[in-house]
């Protein structure tokens, strides 16, 4: 869980920027977007297979160059 300690005389904008960066590193926003709507297990499997296929093609293209 991201958290930011604010020092004396530290502007709020800077603390907010630090907090947003920590949230991004932790992957909270992407997780929230992923869980925003229910996704059927069959759709999850399909997306996972497509992603694996894309990774394999990308790896194959990289090996050819």
Swiss-Prot record:
Q: Report the GO terms under cellular component.
A: ribonucleoprotein complex; ribosome
Q: Does the keyword Ribonucleoprotein apply?
A: yes
Keywords (A to Z) from UniProt: Ribonucleoprotein, Ribosomal protein
Q: List the disulfide bonds.
A: none
Q: Name one Pfam family in it.
A: Ribosomal_S21
Q: Which GO terms describe its molecular function?
A: structural constituent of ribosome
The record's Gene Ontology biological-process terms are:
translation
Record bears the keyword Ligase: no
Q: Which domain of life is it from?
A: Bacteria
The family database entries (Gene3D superfamilies) matched by this protein are listed as: Ribosomal protein S8 (1.20.5.1150)
Q: Which InterPro entries match?
A: Ribosomal_bS21, Ribosomal_bS21_sf
Q: Which PANTHER family does the protein's record reference?
A: MITOCHONDRIAL 28S RIBOSOMAL PROTEIN S21 (PTHR21109), SMALL RIBOSOMAL SUBUNIT PROTEIN BS21 (PTHR21109:SF22)
What the record says about family reads: Belongs to the bacterial ribosomal protein bS21 family.
Protein name (record): Small ribosomal subunit protein bS21
Q: What is the name of the gene encoding this protein?
A: rpsU
